Regions:
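Structural signal for conserved beta-strand scaffold positions within catalytic alpha/beta enzyme cores
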Residues: 52, 81, 103, 118-120, ...
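Short, glycine/acidic-enriched loop or turn micro-motifs at the edges of active sites
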Residues: 26, 84-86, 108, 161, ...
Length: 182
């Protein structure tokens, strides 16, 4: 995990533009991981352009808003796809028009579509992975309410409010860390 998280952050460092995708027919984890990563990167790198794209799902509109991105923005962008096991399920097929592609997921690896693929099937959700990614870089202090809220919604969604068998002690301990700043 340490090595791959460092590789992912090294790639993010190289790009001025990052576009984050997720799967079609999104659930709370798709939205939560996508928007959680977006909000975190915006706080960590305020000079970068960070976008979250895909078809909006009206029942999940309360989680957050998605961005409209022109085709030409993809030219020199890093694309990160969250919570999507295989390429045909990626919402917005422009994902392959970026300069580089990273996959971050918790579903069993059925399609290694990214140049960098991080899949942790032991994680309850991709939102949990994004939380671990943030804490790996000791960035807990830049997690604000917007980041914490969407990641929490993603974790709650994929664990069935912590009732499903994918809920681990690690999952339960995530929110016992120091409180996010307001």
């Amino acid at each position: 995990m340490v090595e791959i998280f460092n590789k992912i952050m090294n790639e993010i460092d190289k790009y001025e533009t990052v576009i984050i995708h997720r799967h079609v027919r999104p659930d709370p984890d798709a939205y939560g991981s996508q928007l959680g990563l977006k909000y975190y990167l915006q706080r960590k790198f305020p000079e970068k352009s960070i976008y979250a794209v895909g078809q909006p799902e009206s029942s999940l509109a309360f989680i957050g808003d998605l961005d409209r991105v022109r085709d030409d923005i993809y030219q020199n962008a890093l694309v990160i796809v969250c919570d999507t096991a295989n390429a045909p399920r990626i919402d917005d097929q422009r994902f392959n028009q970026g300069k580089d592609l990273i996959k971050i997921d918790h579903h069993p690896a059925t399609d290694q579509y990214g140049r960098i693929n991080y899949v942790d099937t032991n994680a309850s959700s991709t939102s949990e992975i994004i939380f671990d990614f943030i804490t790996h870089f000791n960035d807990i202090n830049i997690i604000d309410e917007s980041v914490a809220r969407v990641l929490y919604l993603g974790i709650v969604g994929d664990t069935g409010r912590f009732l499903f068998s994918n809920t681990t002690p690690h999952t339960c301990l995530l929110y016992t860390s120091p409180s996010p700043r307001d």
